[in-house]
Amino acid sequence: MNILNLFNAMPGNIAQGIIWGIMALGVFMTYKILDFADLSVDGSFATGGAVTVILMLSGMNSGTALVVAFICGVVAGVVTGILHTTLGIPGILASILVQIALYSINLSIMEGKANTALPVDKYNLLISLRYIPKSILVSAIFAAALIALMYVYFGTAQGSAIRATGNNPAMSRAQAG
């Protein structure tokens, strides 16, 4: 193994790591605030990517494709919540079930292919590993903005109430009433 190849791969790894760090924020939020380790975030993150790529390849503009992908992620989260609250499945198990199901759903969305690429020359992409320095900068700015937004939100009265409530049913009823 050539050590130079390792160093040449670092910028691409950093760019992807920042993007996956955004997904880790979702897991962190649900676990730290709600005491609910929602691992379905991992599967819904990939589902959003699959939906976006397939819709863009079929001719939909990127903004609309992202909105549809966001809705698909919300549906995945709702399914996790229904499994947990309505069917009484423990949260960690419900999220793992949804995560595993989403891997099969992702394969179905992408017509049986493990991955599908968007041609960078044909689409105007905000982040692409072809332009790694730009990808690192854009991803870092987006991650920093998201962290700042979460910090500000959880400092508000509503955010503080969510942090205080957590997974405490008595506090939830007190907040609602």
Predicted regions and their residues:
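Interfacial loop-to-helix junctions that mark the boundaries of transmembrane helices
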Residues: L4-I14, G63, G88, L126-S139
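Alpha-helical transmembrane segments within multi-pass membrane transporters and channels
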Residues: M60-I100, I141-A144
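Membrane-interface helix caps of multi-pass small-molecule transporters
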Residues: M29, I54, S58, V78, ...
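Membrane-helix/interface signature in polytopic inner-membrane proteins
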Residues: A148-G177
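Membrane-interfacial amphipathic/re-entrant helices at transmembrane-helix boundaries
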Residues: M1-M23, V51, G59-T64
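Transmembrane helix-bundle core of multi-pass membrane transporters
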Residues: G91, S95-T156
